[in-house]
């Protein structure tokens, strides 16, 4: 699936929230940002959850691959990280049809960029409307 501008900013938000550290193994990737991935718990092909901050974590390439290869381990990690109830909410939301029009994507990108700027300036996640 092709990434768009919103995906790129969302990825930076997720990795910034994690302070450029893998949320699984704890390795730091501030000097090599490409090696830290924005890993979606539920596929980003579902627009309803694609940009939901609860649906993504920062994982190094090794941990991301490990979770891709072992979905059971990944599911257990997700439940430990965000809780079973939140995970079930995300799964239910992913099943809802959600179409985003071109002009809406532009507004989404604008909001995400504002949130990233605020996060980089040290604002709290609650202040910027970012759920973790």
Task: Map each language-model feature to its residues.
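Extended interaction regions within the primary functional domain
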Residues: 9-10, 41, 60
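A detector for short metal-coordination/catalytic motifs
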Residues: 69-132
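Short, charged surface segments at domain edges that flank catalytic/cofactor-binding sites
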Residues: 1-21, 98-99
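Short Cys/His-centered divalent metal-binding micro-motifs
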Residues: 27-30, 56-83
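Conserved aromatic-histidine-acidic binding/catalytic patches
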Residues: 2, 6, 48, 66
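General structural signal for alpha-helix termini and helix-helix connectors
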Residues: 44-47, 62-65, 96
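Histidine-centered nuclease catalytic patch
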Residues: 23-57
């Amino acid at each position: 699936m092709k990434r768009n501008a919103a995906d790129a900013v969302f990825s930076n938000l997720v990795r910034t929230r994690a302070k450029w550290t893998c949320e699984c193994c704890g390795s730091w990737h501030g000097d090599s940002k490409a090696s830290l991935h924005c890993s979606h718990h539920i596929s980003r092909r579902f627009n309803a959850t694609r940009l939901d901050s609860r649906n993504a974590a920062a994982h190094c390439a090794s941990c991301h691959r490990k979770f891709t290869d072992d979905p059971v381990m990944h599911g257990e990690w997700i439940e430990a990280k965000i809780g079973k109830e939140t995970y079930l909410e995300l799964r239910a939301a992913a099943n809802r049809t959600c179409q985003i029009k071109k002009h809406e994507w532009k507004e989404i990108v604008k909001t995400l960029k504002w949130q990233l700027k605020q996060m980089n300036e040290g604002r709290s996640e609650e202040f910027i409307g970012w759920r973790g």
